[in-house]
C-alpha cells in the first residue's frame, strides 16, 4: 500500500490497524475505502491495468531513468525467463538493447500514447537475430498474447489519491511475484512525484521476501528500497524472519 502523508489521522489508523499482525495488502482495503482512499484490484480478469513499461523521466538525480527502467525490466524478465540460474549474460545484453530501442518514440515525443507496452518489447525481441532473443520472446508470449496478459496494457488506474491500496491477492501463483515487482516500480514512480511536491510516501508491502529469491530481482529490490529512503519514501515490510531467511 502506498500513502503520501503529512501527519494526519490515517498514519495513526494504519499503524493501529497493522498492529503486530502480518497484514495482507487486501486486508487494508476496507480501511482505505473508509478513509476515502483508492483500492486498485489487479487480477487476470480485472479491468484495472498497470503498464510495467511506464517510464518517469524525472525519476533520478544521478542515473539515467532509462538505465533504471532497464534494471527493472531485467528483473521482470528474470522472474519470467531466468529459472534457477537466472538470466545469462547474452540474455541480459539482448534485453537491455531492446529496452533502449523500445523507448525511442516516447523519448522523442514523451506523450502518454507513445508509452510502449510489453507487447512492443516482445515484438522487438522477435526481430533480433540471436536465438536467445527468440527464447526470451517465447517465454514472454503467455504474458503478452496468452492467458496471463494482464500486464500488457496501458495504465488506466488513478493513483492521485492520498492513500492507494494495490490488491493483488487474486493474481494467482504464476503472477504474484511479477505483480509485486510491477507494483513496486509503480510506487517508485509515485515516490518521485511526491518528492517533487515535498511529500513523504509511506509504503507497506506484504511478503517482500518473495522478491529476494532471484539474484537480479533481489539486487533491484535492494537498490530501489535504498532509493525510496533517499527520495522520501518510508518502506515497511512484514515479518523480519522471512526477510532474513530469503
Describe the residue ranges of each PLM region.
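C-terminal regions of RecA-like/P-loop NTPase motor modules
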Residues: 245-246
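P-loop NTPase motor domains
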Residues: 26-37, 42-46, 51-233, 237
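Short linear segments in intrinsically disordered or otherwise low-structure-confidence regions
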Residues: 17-18
Amino acid at each position: 500500500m502506498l500513502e503520501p502523508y503529512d501527519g494526519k489521522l490515517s498514519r495513526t489508523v494504519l499503524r493501529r490497524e497493522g498492529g503486530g499482525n502480518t497484514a495482507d495488502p487486501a486486508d487494508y482495503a476496507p480501511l482505505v475505502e473508509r478513509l476515502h482512499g483508492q483500492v486498485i484490484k489487479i487480477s487476470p480478469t480485472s479491468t484495472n491495468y498497470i503498464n510495467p513499461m511506464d517510464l518517469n523521466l524525472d525519476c533520478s538525480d544521478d542515473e539515467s531513468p532509462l538505465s533504471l527502467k532497464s534494471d527493472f525490466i531485467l528483473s521482470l524478465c528474470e522472474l519470467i525467463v531466468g529459472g534457477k540460474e537466472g538470466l545469462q549474460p547474452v540474455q541480459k545484453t539482448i534485453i537491455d538493447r531492446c529496452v533502449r530501442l523500445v523507448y525511442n518514440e516516447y523519448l522523442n515525443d514523451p506523450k502518454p500514447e507513445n508509452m510502449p507496452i510489453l507487447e512492443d518489447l516482445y515484438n522487438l525481441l522477435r526481430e533480433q537475430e540471436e536465438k536467445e532473443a527468440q527464447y526470451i520472446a517465447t517465454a514472454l508470449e503467455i504474458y503478452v498474447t496468452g492467458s496471463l496478459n494482464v500486464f500488457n496494457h496501458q495504465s488506466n488506474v488513478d493513483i492521485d489519491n492520498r492513500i492507494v491500496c494495490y490488491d493483488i491477492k487474486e493474481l494467482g501463483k504464476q503472477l504474484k511475484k511479477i505483480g509485486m515487482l510491477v507494483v513496486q516500480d509503480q510506487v517508485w514512480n509515485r515516490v518521485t512525484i511526491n518528492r517533487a511536491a515535498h511529500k513523504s510516501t509511506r509504503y507497506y508491502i506484504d511478503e517482500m521476501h518473495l522478491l529476494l529469491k532471484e539474484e537480479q530481482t533481489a539486487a533491484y529490490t535492494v537498490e530501489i528500497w535504498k532509493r525510496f529512503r533517499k527520495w522520501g519514501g518510508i518502506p515497511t515490510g512484514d515479518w523480519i524472519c522471512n526477510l532474513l531467511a530469503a
